[in-house]
Structures are given as C-alpha cells and as structure tokens.
Amino acid sequence: MSDAPTKWRIKSARTVYSNRWITVREYQTVAPTGADALYGLVHMHNLALGVLPIDEQGRTILVGQQRFPFGRYSWELPEGGGLPEITPLEGAQRELAEEAGLKAGSWLQLVGDMHMSNSVTDERAYAFLAWGLSEDHSFAKDSSEELSVRRVSFAEALKRADSGEITDAFTLVMLYKADHLLRTGGLPEELAKLMQAQT
C-alpha cells in the first residue's frame, strides 16, 4: 500500500520535558487536511526489545512485575529497552540474561521495526524467538525491578493471553505471531517440535 500524498508540516517545536529515557516535544503543525493542529510526541531514547524463549521442554518464560502506569501486576515475556549503540539482537540477549538469567544458542527475529503506539510516540520494537537455553548471570538485574519468573508451556501462555490475564501488548504480539508461524510452518522444525511438545 502506498503512503498518503500529504504529510504533516511542522511550524514550530519545543521540548516540554526530558530525562534519560524519554523526551516530550510539543509541535505546532499543519495537518494533512490543512488544519492547524497541536501535537504532543513522546520520543523514546531506546528501542523496545522482547524475547520469547523456549526451553528444552517446550516451555516459555513469563516475568511478573508491578507496572507503575496502571498500578497493577503484569505477566510478560522478557522485554525492556535496548541501547541505541548496540544491535536489537544484542539488546535482546541482554534482556534475556537480565530478566531470566538465561542465554540462548539459537535466535530468530520474530518482529522487526514495529511501531508501538504511533499516534503519540515514536517507539520502535524488535522481538526474537530464542531456544537452546542455558544459564547466564553475567548481567545485574535492574535495581528498580522486583521480578517473579515462571515457566509455562507455550500453549498455557497462549491461554493466558486469550483469557485476558496477559495484557501487555508487546507480549501478546510475540505470542500470537509465534503461534501463527507455528501453525503455518514458518518455524525451524526443531523449534516447532519443542513448542508443540505440551499442546
């Protein structure tokens, strides 16, 4: 599909707030319709990175933590922010080690350059499937995070997504994309066998 011919035009911009993770900018713009419009944009300094790990028994790993914006506990796949000076894969490898204490011998990109909430933020996301897992405690955990880690079958993780127990959008995308690839023959045979082991 082609892009729309008319783009937004920026008349002026100012930084409203900034810290090490985000910058909030306010724009005076002309919309594609020609109307003047005020636009607020949250610029993310890091990439969003996620990992769907599969162990030798066909289980994946859910990480539980208290999420500040909604004031509730959330079960998610390992995910976090990736520094801009390293590749998405390197960042995902670090997240898997930090949150789950694991490394993987095999990696497959699951999602590339996904726009997380493109009406208000420029956050971009990459996600990977990881298998051939072994322990890796070379990275210290984030001091602001108190994490719980559980291993569940891939099928059980999907059930928790279907039931609404899992609400994190990035986790839902990873689970459903992996399930689609599993059903359509888009995964390496060894990985597919692991994921189907407990279905």
Language model regions located:
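Nudix hydrolase/Nudix homology domain
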Residues: 2-8, 73, 84, 110, ...
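Conserved Nudix-box catalytic region and its N-terminal flanking loop in Nudix hydrolases
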Residues: 3-7, 42-45, 50-94, 98, ...
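Active-site segment of metal-dependent pyrophosphate-handling enzymes
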Residues: 23, 43-46, 55-57, 67, ...
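Short, well-ordered beta-strand micro-motif
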Residues: 26-28, 53, 129-131, 151-153
